[in-house]
């Protein structure tokens, strides 16, 4: 199936809707939770920080467990439905509970387990791409652009709903979106591996059920995670940690050191998110041609240059002019590594996607801690130098990926290195 004919596939259209709904759920909940805790249960800044830190740690563990278990299930849609409904339950909890510890428990149990939906969507996307005969980086980038669009419109809608009505209305809408996503997963998405009519069999398909090696499951979730995968994960954590530091630090830097309006930070983040949408698709389209490792190295160069320039930029036009560099590296970091991880763990898309999702959350957790430490001692502007250091180190790790031992590639007619791609 050609790339752009994908949109005529009913299963792909439903997957786009699911990705958009899940993206909006995250865009409604994540940016508003700190304000919700402060206004409804009078949480202190320390309590808010502990709330996010505890949830992040819990999500890392639940992502890995759900990912390993999902690879042994015959139908991944079961996990998608369950996690979407858990997100709905968490949103309902936010509408009725007004005790800090009850909200914390709800967040850990419902949103902690429900957050695994993010990684499972990656895994399902990979399986559907293989079944449709479409290159996975392009397909993944296409769907990630839908999530980015949700994050462009979601936060403004969320804060508008709070201003016009209340937190209750916002979280009821969040619960409804989660239920819609669950219904689409159950009755709109085909079983993973089902081929569209007229689609030739994928070259990686096995000849029979007995030819496919059974995934190791929960007790063996780290089986096959060798040096190559660990270096790749380290690079991802550093990149996403730098991104978290930037997003946390930017509003404080803009208002405290540049003395601009707080809306300026929202404008910068919004412009970058809009630019990311086409770049996500382009990164996916070019990943196999250029090579995933090369794209990651280019991304780290763009990121290091961007963060290295920020301390010297003092005007809004120049800040806006720098956003294409930011969007370019983020588009690669949010798309290519998850496909590379799936390539490094063939037959285990759930575990590989959970590793990426966990690395994403570990990067956010570590980035939040680093911002507080660096800003306290040196100021907000110096945080960007720390970001540049992290992305430069991520680039060095990406350089080592070629020489690191890696697992055998997936059985196919293409014998290129999973991170190198085809020769141009």
Please identify what each model-predicted range represents.
Residues 61-75, 162, 279-291, 375-376:
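Helix-to-loop junctions at the C-terminal end of transmembrane segments
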Residues 115-130, 332-345:
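Intracellular juxtamembrane helix-capping segments at the cytosolic ends
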Residues 279, 293-337:
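C-terminal transmembrane helical hairpin of 12-TM major facilitator-type secondary transporters
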Residues 20, 101-118, 237, 318-332:
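Hydrophobic core of transmembrane alpha-helices in multi-pass small-molecule transporters
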Residues 347-378:
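A late C-terminal transmembrane helix in Major Facilitator Superfamily
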Residues 1-12, 190-233, 415-424:
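Juxtamembrane intracellular "pre-TM" segments in multi-pass secondary transporters
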Residues 2-56, 231, 240-257:
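Helix-loop boundary and gating motifs at the non-cytosolic
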Residues 78-92, 175, 294-309, 388:
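Structural signature of the two symmetry-related core transmembrane helices
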């Amino acid at each position: 199936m050609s790339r752009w004919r994908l949109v005529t596939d009913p299963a792909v259209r439903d997957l786009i809707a699911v990705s958009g709904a899940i993206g909006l759920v995250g865009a409604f909940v994540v940016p508003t939770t700190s304000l919700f805790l402060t206004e409804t249960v009078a949480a202190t800044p320390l309590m808010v920080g502990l709330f996010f830190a505890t949830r992040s740690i819990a999500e890392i563990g639940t992502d890995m467990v759900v990912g390993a278990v999902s690879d042994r299930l015959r139908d991944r849609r079961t996990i998608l439905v369950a996690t979407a409904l858990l997100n709905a339950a968490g949103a309902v909890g936010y509408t009725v509970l007004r005790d800090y510890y009850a909200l914390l428990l709800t967040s850990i149990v419902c949103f902690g387990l429900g957050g695994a939906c993010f990684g499972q969507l990656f895994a399902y996307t990979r399986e559907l791409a293989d079944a449709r005969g479409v290159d996975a980086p392009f397909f993944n980038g296409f769907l990630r652009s839908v999530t980015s669009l949700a994050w462009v419109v979601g936060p403004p809608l969320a804060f508008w709903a709070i201003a016009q009505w209340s937190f209750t209305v916002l979280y009821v809408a969040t619960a409804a979106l989660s239920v819609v996503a669950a219904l689409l997963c159950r009755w709109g998405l085909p079983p993973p591996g089902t081929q569209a009519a007229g689609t030739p069999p994928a070259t990686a398909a096995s000849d029979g059920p007995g030819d496919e090696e059974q995934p190791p499951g929960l007790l063996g979730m780290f089986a096959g995670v060798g040096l190559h995968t660990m270096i790749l994960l380290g690079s991802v954590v550093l990149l996403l940690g730098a991104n978290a530091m930037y997003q946390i630090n930017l509003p404080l830097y803009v208002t405290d050191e540049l003395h601009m309006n707080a809306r300026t930070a929202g404008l910068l983040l919004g412009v970058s998110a809009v630019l990311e949408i086409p770049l996500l698709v382009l990164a996916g389209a070019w990943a196999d041609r250029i090579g995933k490792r090369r794209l990651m190295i280019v991304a780290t160069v763009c990121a290091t240059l961007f963060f290295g320039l920020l301390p010297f930029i003092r005007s809004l036009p120049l800040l806006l002019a720098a956003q294409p560099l930011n969007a370019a590296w983020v588009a690669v970091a949010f798309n290519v590594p998850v496909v590379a991880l799936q390539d490094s763990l063939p037959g285990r898309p759930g575990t590989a996607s959970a590793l990426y999702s966990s690395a994403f959350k570990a990067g956010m957790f570590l980035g939040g801690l680093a911002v507080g430490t660096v800003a306290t001692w040196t100021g907000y502007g110096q945080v960007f130098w720390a970001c540049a250091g992290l992305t430069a180190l991520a680039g060095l790790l990406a350089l080592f990926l070629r020489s690191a031992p890696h697992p055998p590639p997936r059985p196919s007619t293409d014998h290129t290195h999973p991170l190198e791609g085809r020769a141009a």
